[in-house]
């Protein structure tokens, strides 16, 4: 996975996906259905590898996908080892009208785990437009995907059904795995007031905010900010400090005590010579 090197590039993230499966399951049909893609493969002279790029929009981010596919022939196993290097996602493709292609998934998964272990995967049942010739029940494929812990789609390049959706879901899984969890969240720049509020409430319990020498409106905002942001969590964990006075040494000492509930404001008529502080 890579990010753009300059603002002129037309994408925010670059991902490499592999389409894996037996021959004649329609992997090339899936690639050909991508109208906006380009097909410039560095392995095109080998005649057994299809390559295409396309750009999808994921939560407002432009994600460019490099899609690689081999013909599924055994003589390309050595090539598979080479071009699987650096892959971020794998699309397991079978033909819903070809039972043998579905039963061969275990063989492909074993090969993937050998050359690209731990890479996120999705299972795709291709040629949904041939449902009248179906040999693989959807329920069986769904159960198989659940056993593998992967997402399952049935797609149709002829009807342009679920092609982009399946790519988008795999891209989402890959980006989340790489901890790019800012996708889908608005990039908000904190104001100076928010930064000041965060600093104050991080070291001041809620019940002591009212005692700060600040305008009433600002104190109210600070309490609301503290409740909303949860920055008072360390006071809620059942630990606090108590300032006690020693009668023998006539000096104050700070000792750690446990409380079983969140600290609250002491009553006005309290006669204790100690109070809770953070």
Swiss-Prot record:
What CDD domains has UniProt attached to this entry?
A: SOCS_Rab40
Gene Ontology CC terms, in alphabetical order:
cytoplasm; endosome; mitochondrion; plasma membrane; synaptic vesicle
Q: Which cofactors, if any, are listed as required?
A: Mg(2+)
Primary localization class, coarse: membrane
Which pathway is it part of?
Answer: Protein modification; protein ubiquitination
Record: residues binding GTP = 26-28, 72, 126-127
Domain SOCS box spans what residues? 175-228
Please verify whether the record's keywords include Nucleotide-binding: yes
**Cell compartments where the protein resides:** Membrane; Cytoplasm; Mitochondrion
Reactions performed catalytically: GTP + H2O = GDP + phosphate + H(+)
Query: What function does this protein fulfil?
Result: May act as substrate-recognition component of the ECS(RAB40) E3 ubiquitin ligase complex which mediates the ubiquitination and subsequent proteasomal degradation of target proteins. The Rab40 subfamily belongs to the Rab family that are key regulators of intracellular membrane trafficking, from the formation of transport vesicles to their fusion with membranes. Rabs cycle between an inactive GDP-bound form and an active GTP-bound form that is able to recruit to membranes different sets of downstream effectors directly responsible for vesicle formation, movement, tethering and fusion.
PANTHER family of this UniProt entry? LD44762P
Task: Copy the domain comment.
Answer: The SOCS box contains two defined motifs including the BC box that recruits and binds Elongin BC complex, and the Cul box which interacts with the Cullin family of proteins to form a ECS (Elongin-Cullin-SOCS-box protein) E3 ubiquitin ligase complex.
- Protein name from the UniProt record: Ras-related protein Rab-40A-like
The taxonomic lineage of its organism, from the top, reads: Eukaryota, Metazoa, Chordata, Craniata, Vertebrata
């Amino acid at each position: 996975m890579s990010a753009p090197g300059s603002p002129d590039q037309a994408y925010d993230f670059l991902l490499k996906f592999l389409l894996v499966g037996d021959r004649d399951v329609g992997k090339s049909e899936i690639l050909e259905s991508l109208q906006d893609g380009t097909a410039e493969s560095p392995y095109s002279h080998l005649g057994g590898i299809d390559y295409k790029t396309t750009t999808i929009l994921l939560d407002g981010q432009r994600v460019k996908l490099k899609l690689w596919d081999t013909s599924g022939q055994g003589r390309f196993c050595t090539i598979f080892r080479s071009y699987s290097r650096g892959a971020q996602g794998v699309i397991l493709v079978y033909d819903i009208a070809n039972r043998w292609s579905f039963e061969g998934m275990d063989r492909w998964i074993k090969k993937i785990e050998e050359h690209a272990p731990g890479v996120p995967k999705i299972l795709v049942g291709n040629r949904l437009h041939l449902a009248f010739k179906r040999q693989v029940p959807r329920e069986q494929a769904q159960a198989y995907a659940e056993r593998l812990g992967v997402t399952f789609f049935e797609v149709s390049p002829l009807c342009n059904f679920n092609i982009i959706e399946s790519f988008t879901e795999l891209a989402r899984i890959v980006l989340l795995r790489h901890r790019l969890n800012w996708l889908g969240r608005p990039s908000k720049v904190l104001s100076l007031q928010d930064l000041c509020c965060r600093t104050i409430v991080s070291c001041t319990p809620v019940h002591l905010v009212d005692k700060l020498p600040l305008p009433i409106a600002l104190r109210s905002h600070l309490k609301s900010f503290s409740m909303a942001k949860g920055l008072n969590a360390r006071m809620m964990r059942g630990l606090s400090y108590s300032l006690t006075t020693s009668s023998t040494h006539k000096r104050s000492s700070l000792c750690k005590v446990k409380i079983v509930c969140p600290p609250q404001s002491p009553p006005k008529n309290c006669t204790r010579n100690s109070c809770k502080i953070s």
